[in-house]
Amino acid sequence: MALSREQMAQRVAREMQDGYYVNLGIGIPTLVANYIPEGMEVMLQSENGLLGMGAFPTEAEVDADMINAGKQTVTARIGASIFSSAESFAMIRGGHIDLTVLGAFEVDVEGNIASWMIPGKLVKGMGGAMDLVAGAENIIVTMTHASKDGESKLLPRCSLPLTGAGCIKRVLTDLAYLEIQDGAFILKERAPGVSVEEIIAKTAGKLIVPDHVPEMQFAAQ
């Protein structure tokens, strides 16, 4: 079956490395903060001006003045820094973020990403995504494999206005973990209980399927 939002966050958290500075985008990416491997030193950055963001707060820990870029209440780790958004974006544009995790509407086989606008619908604005895709070389996109209408979000070419071009190399969906190389998606892992055939059927862009595609593993709850 398809991964839950929490399982997607758990899988992305496995891509963290000790000493990383990581920016988490709005939506599913924010959940990753709850699944950083124990004992690993990772500094989470929020573009509204927080370095050292912690997990989501318990009810007793909620501080309405401590929020992330998505206006969600968060915690701050010991040693965290709070600063202006100008300084925050200087970190991003200067290439000081080791890993960025973003949501998206579409990704294509050339590594293009569309994440900010659907024509005819309310547009909130670009946010920090354009700076992040330009300033970070290591980006993971997390999104559902298909839209609510069943249309694939993994395309030969993005149909929506782009956020960035040729910048995405890894995608985690609720069905699969894929890499992008040489104009194709490469299937690396599949969600537990999801068949390769289902992933093929729901991927519009060119898809390379190895002889063996392992299932993702999750600890029993």
Q: Where in the sequence are the language-model features?
A:
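Conserved phosphate- and dinucleotide-binding cores of soluble alpha/beta proteins
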Residues: 3-7, 58-221
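N-terminal active-site beta-alpha-beta segment that forms phosphate/nucleotide-binding
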Residues: 1-77
